[in-house]
């Protein structure tokens, strides 16, 4: 199986506070934004701070994913389309880059390159997608300094086209075949 950081999904502020005793990231589940009081917030994956931990009452109305922070040197963006697996490695040159590197996409601070996958890794992805009964998914992994791959999440509607096109991966052609056999 995959290495998975400790994770919980909760809308209980007390449970969330207890979980956040170690470096933790916070992810919205339903959408990347929420309303709290009279303000509207847009939230990428964010490292939990003392201020956020002290103000967790907003999660009562919308569960969140809390996940142990992985000190990463790269991210893997896996695009699964109808049995085919495309893997792009994303790195950044920004010192102290945000936990979520998506805002850096399309800038000179974010680089993508094809990542050579082992047959075992591809088989694990295919097995997971079969078990989840998904024909498409964008799957995120973090790579730590020891080279360990940490499974972060499966996005059944995640971003994929921009970076796969950028580095010459034929994911769009695979999607076309999937949708118009």
Briefly describe each language-model feature range.
Residues 6, 67-70, 130-132:
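Short, solvent-exposed secondary-structure boundary motifs
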Residues 16, 20-116:
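Phosphate-binding site of ATP-dependent enzymes
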Residues 1-6, 11-21:
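Conserved N-proximal alpha/beta basic substrate-recognition cap immediately N-terminal to
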Residues 2, 73, 82-83, 134-136, ...:
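Coil-to-beta-strand transition motifs
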Residues 112-123, 127-134, 143-181:
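C-terminal active-site "lid" helix and adjoining low-complexity regulatory extension at the edge
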Residues 139-141:
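Hydrophobic residue at the +6 position relative to the catalytic HRD Asp in the kinase catalytic loop
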């Amino acid at each position: 199986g995959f290495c998975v950081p400790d994770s919980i999904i909760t809308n209980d502020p007390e449970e969330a506070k207890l979980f956040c005793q170690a470096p933790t990231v916070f992810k919205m589940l339903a959408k990347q934004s929420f309303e709290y009081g009279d303000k509207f917030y847009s939230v990428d994956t964010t490292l939990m701070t003392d201020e956020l931990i002290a103000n967790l009452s907003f999660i009562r109305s919308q569960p969140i994913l809390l996940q142990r922070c992985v000190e990463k040197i790269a991210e893997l963006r896996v695009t699964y389309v109808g049995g085919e697996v495309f893997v792009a490695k994303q790195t950044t040159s920004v010192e102290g880059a945000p936990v979520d590197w998506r805002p850096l996409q399309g800038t000179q601070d974010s680089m993508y390159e094809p990542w050579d996958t082992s047959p075992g890794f591809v088989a694990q992805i295919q097995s997971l997608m079969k078990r989840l009964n998904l024909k498409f998914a964008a799957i995120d992994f973090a790579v730590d300094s020891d080279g360990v791959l940490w499974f972060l999440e499966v996005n059944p509607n995640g971003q994929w086209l921009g970076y796969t096109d950028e580095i010459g991966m034929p994911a769009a052609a695979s999607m076309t075949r999937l949708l118009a056999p």
